């Protein structure tokens, strides 16, 4: 019985702590069902729409890319979170940098980042992307992709599990929800 409980805890998908406020709340008071309309701010509406439709572009450079592909497979099913991988930077709003970034690839990373439409976010996945990792002291390795592009979420590990990436994506959704889109 203890083994089954352990397996059940491994098979569950991670959820970020704290409540993510949603316009349509299934429990408690629901203003749409009670009054027939919802009042909200433009910021809240835009952020609500963005958290449900994140389109990441993969920038897989090493072994972390295999775990990124695993996260997109059927077991974890990122589609249910509104995450659909896109092949082009012009169609995506999230970049996942996974793996060792070398000096020769740094200009290409920046060029692809600049081609993404605003607003854009970056997830740094793995020890190599976060700070150079195992190859930190190599002459050709960039010691963290945050030296090239601004990073919003860091996913630690060597390589991080697919569940860790899903947790990082959920944390990014919470961060998007809290940002103010339109300056007052």
UniProtKB/Swiss-Prot annotation:
<keyword id="KW-0874">Quinone</keyword>
<dbReference type="GO" id="GO:0005886">
    <property type="term" value="C:plasma membrane"/>
</dbReference>
<protein>
    <recommendedName>
        <fullName>NADH-quinone oxidoreductase subunit B</fullName>
        <ecNumber>7.1.1.-</ecNumber>
    </recommendedName>
</protein>
<dbReference type="Pfam" id="PF01058">
    <property type="entry name" value="Oxidored_q6"/>
</dbReference>
<keyword id="KW-0520">NAD</keyword>
<keyword id="KW-0997">Cell inner membrane</keyword>
<keyword id="KW-0472">Membrane</keyword>
<keyword id="KW-0004">4Fe-4S</keyword>
<dbReference type="GO" id="GO:0015990">
    <property type="term" value="P:electron transport coupled proton transport"/>
</dbReference>
<dbReference type="GO" id="GO:0051539">
    <property type="term" value="F:4 iron, 4 sulfur cluster binding"/>
</dbReference>
<comment type="function">
    <text>NDH-1 shuttles electrons from NADH, via FMN and iron-sulfur (Fe-S) centers, to quinones in the respiratory chain. The immediate electron acceptor for the enzyme in this species is believed to be ubiquinone. Couples the redox reaction to proton translocation (for every two electrons transferred, four hydrogen ions are translocated across the cytoplasmic membrane), and thus conserves the redox energy in a proton gradient.</text>
</comment>
<comment type="similarity">
    <text>Belongs to the complex I 20 kDa subunit family.</text>
</comment>
<dbReference type="GO" id="GO:0008137">
    <property type="term" value="F:NADH dehydrogenase (ubiquinone) activity"/>
</dbReference>
<feature type="binding site">
    <location>
        <position position="64"/>
    </location>
    <ligand>
        <name>[4Fe-4S] cluster</name>
    </ligand>
</feature>
<dbReference type="GO" id="GO:0048038">
    <property type="term" value="F:quinone binding"/>
</dbReference>
<comment type="subunit">
    <text>NDH-1 is composed of 14 different subunits. Subunits NuoB, C, D, E, F, and G constitute the peripheral sector of the complex.</text>
</comment>
<keyword id="KW-0830">Ubiquinone</keyword>
<dbReference type="GO" id="GO:0009060">
    <property type="term" value="P:aerobic respiration"/>
</dbReference>
<dbReference type="InterPro" id="IPR006138">
    <property type="entry name" value="NADH_UQ_OxRdtase_20Kd_su"/>
</dbReference>
<keyword id="KW-0411">Iron-sulfur</keyword>
<dbReference type="InterPro" id="IPR006137">
    <property type="entry name" value="NADH_UbQ_OxRdtase-like_20kDa"/>
</dbReference>
<dbReference type="GO" id="GO:0005506">
    <property type="term" value="F:iron ion binding"/>
</dbReference>
<keyword id="KW-1003">Cell membrane</keyword>
<dbReference type="GO" id="GO:0050136">
    <property type="term" value="F:NADH:ubiquinone reductase (non-electrogenic) activity"/>
</dbReference>
<keyword id="KW-0813">Transport</keyword>
<keyword id="KW-1278">Translocase</keyword>
<keyword id="KW-0408">Iron</keyword>
<feature type="binding site">
    <location>
        <position position="128"/>
    </location>
    <ligand>
        <name>[4Fe-4S] cluster</name>
    </ligand>
</feature>
<dbReference type="GO" id="GO:0045271">
    <property type="term" value="C:respiratory chain complex I"/>
</dbReference>
<keyword id="KW-0479">Metal-binding</keyword>
<feature type="binding site">
    <location>
        <position position="63"/>
    </location>
    <ligand>
        <name>[4Fe-4S] cluster</name>
    </ligand>
</feature>
<feature type="binding site">
    <location>
        <position position="158"/>
    </location>
    <ligand>
        <name>[4Fe-4S] cluster</name>
    </ligand>
</feature>
């Amino acid at each position: 019985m203890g083994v089954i409980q352990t397996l059940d805890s491994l098979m569950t998908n991670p959820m970020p702590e704290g409540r993510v406020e949603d316009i349509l709340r299934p429990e408690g008071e629901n203003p749409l069902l009670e009054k027939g309309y919802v009042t909200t701010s433009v910021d809240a509406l835009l952020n609500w729409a963005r958290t449900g439709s994140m389109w990441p572009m993969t920038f897989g450079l090493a072994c972390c890319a295999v775990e990124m592909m695993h996260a997109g497979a059927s077991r974890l099913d990122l589609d249910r979170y509104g995450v659909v991988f896109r092949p082009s930077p012009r169609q995506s709003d999230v970049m996942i940098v996974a793996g060792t970034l070398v000096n020769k690839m740094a200009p290409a990373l920046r060029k692809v980042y600049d081609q993404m439409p605003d607003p854009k976010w970056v997830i740094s996945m793995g020890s190599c992307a976060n700070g150079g990792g195992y190859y930190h002291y190599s002459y050709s390795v960039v010691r963290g992709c945050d030296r090239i592009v601004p990073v919003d979420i860091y996913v630690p590990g060597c390589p991080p599990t697919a569940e860790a990436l899903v947790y990082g994506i959920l944390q990014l959704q919470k961060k998007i929800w809290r940002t103010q889109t339109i300056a007052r």
